[in-house]
Amino acid sequence: IFIDVTSLEVCSQDMIADICKAIPVMDGWRRTLPEGRLPEGGIENIRLFRTYTELYLRNHPDVNAPLDLIVTQKEATPYGIPVYVYFFIKDKAWASFERKQSDIFDHLMSIVPEFGLRIYQRP
C-alpha cells in the first residue's frame, strides 16, 4: 500500500482519541502504553496505521498469526511511502487464498483515511 507523503503528520491527542473511538482495537493498544502516555515527540499517523494493521492481522481468523507476520515501511518513492504487509493465510486453496487476501487488503485500504492518511494515486 503506497501512502501519500503529504498526508503524514504527528497526531494530536484529539486525533488519537478520534482514532481510538472509531477503531476499538486502537483504544486497547493505547491502554498498553506505559502510563497511557505517547512517546516523547508524539506519534505519527502512519505508525498508528502500521500498528493497526499488525493488530488486525494478528486477530484475523483467516491469518496464520503464529507464522511470520511483518508490517514494515520502506523509503519514500516517487509513488509515495510503501507499507509492506507480509502474512500467511491458513487456507492454501488458491482461489480461496486469493479471495481472503483480497478481502484483507480491501479492508486495509478502506481504513487508511481513519488515520488521516491517503493512498497515493498518480495524477
Write out the residue ranges for each language-model feature.
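Structured, soluble regulatory/oligomerization domains located on the cytosolic or IMS-facing side
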Residues: I1-P123
